[in-house]
């Protein structure tokens, strides 16, 4: 199954070659919404839970295309971090208001991915693999968060003394963003590999639905209504 070409990477490159992250992300969501998610759903409906999961069958090909699409998203965030590190570690203007509570260092918290997999009632073997990934996340997230905090504190102290090095500060922010995206990429790859076949496809379908739901107009309308009438 041929994969659709990825949208051009974000950044400040030559006109026509690159575009703002807002435009990239809109195109990325559009491709996930169609054709990738419908192709995956059709492959799931025509397969069974006993699918062998060979990477040449339609189900595995559709799942691999969705996984590659998420990996391309994090690669795009890496490219954005090299162009504008401050934006890469914050909530970009392309994010929906519903996404904001779930963000960590510029994108979804990796623990959301393992929580999503747990909600699918995985087998004991897959649950054990998820536990291992969770332990890795619990070790890495505080380390990256502490590093970001130390970078911020060092810049504040240097600014007060009149010796702030903006270039070094941005370089550190870039490295933090790259490490966070590396963790996200590894978490998804490890979980997909552990699940395999039909379970991996179910997991990627659920992840796609979750991401798209945060940009669904009806969901956002209800979210805005709740914000407009707190406590009702």
Swiss-Prot record:
Pfam families reported for this sequence: DOG1
The terms describing its cellular component in GO are:
cytoplasm; pollen aperture
Q: Listed GO molecular functions?
A: sequence-specific DNA binding
Does the keyword Ribonucleoprotein belong to this entry? no
Entries under InterPro entries matching the protein: Seed_Dev/Stress_Resp_Reg, TGA_domain
User: Where found, per UniProt?
Assistant: Cytoplasm
UniProt key word Calcium: no
Report keywords, A-Z.
Cytoplasm
Report the record's Gene Ontology biological process terms: DNA-templated transcription; pollen aperture formation; pollen development
- What happens when the protein's gene is inactivated? Absence of entire pollen aperture, leading to male sterility.
UniProt subunit comment: Interacts with LECRKS7/DAF1.
Q: What does this protein do?
A: Required for pollen aperture formation, male fertility and LECRKS7/DAF1 function. Seems to be involved in operculum protrusion. Participates in the modification of plasma membrane at future aperture sites, possibly by creating close contact between the plasma membrane and callose wall to prevent primexine formation and sporopollenin deposition.
Q: What is the official name of this protein in its record?
A: Protein INAPERTURATE POLLEN 1 homolog
Organism from which the protein derives: Oryza sativa subsp. japonica (Rice)
- Record lineage: Eukaryota, Viridiplantae, Streptophyta, Embryophyta, Tracheophyta
Q: Which gene encodes it?
A: INP1
């Amino acid at each position: 199954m041929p994969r659709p070409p990825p949208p051009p990477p974000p950044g400040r490159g030559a006109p026509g070659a690159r575009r703002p992250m807002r435009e990239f992300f809109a195109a990325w969501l559009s491709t996930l919404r169609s054709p990738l998610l419908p192709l995956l759903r059709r492959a799931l409906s025509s397969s069974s839970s006993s699918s062998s999961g060979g990477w040449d069958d339609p189900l595995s090909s559709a799942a691999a295309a969705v996984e590659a699409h998420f990996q391309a998203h994090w690669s795009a965030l890496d490219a954005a971090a090299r162009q504008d590190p401050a934006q890469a570690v914050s909530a970009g203007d392309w994010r929906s208001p519903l996404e904001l509570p779930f963000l960590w260092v510029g994108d979804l918290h990796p623990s959301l991915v393992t929580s999503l997999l747990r909600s699918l009632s995985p087998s004991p073997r897959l649950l054990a693999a998820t536990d291992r990934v969770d332990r890795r996340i619990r070790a890495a997230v505080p380390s990256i968060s502490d590093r970001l905090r130390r970078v911020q504190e060092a810049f504040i102290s240097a600014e007060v003394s009149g010796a702030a090095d903006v270039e070094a500060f941005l370089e550190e922010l870039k490295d933090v963003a790259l490490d966070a995206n590396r963790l996200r990429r590894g978490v998804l790859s490890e979980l997909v590999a552990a699940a395999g076949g039909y379970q991996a496809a179910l997991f990627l379908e659920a992840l796609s639905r979750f991401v798209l739901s945060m940009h669904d107009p009806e969901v956002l309308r209800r979210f805005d209504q709740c914000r407009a009438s707190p406590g009702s």
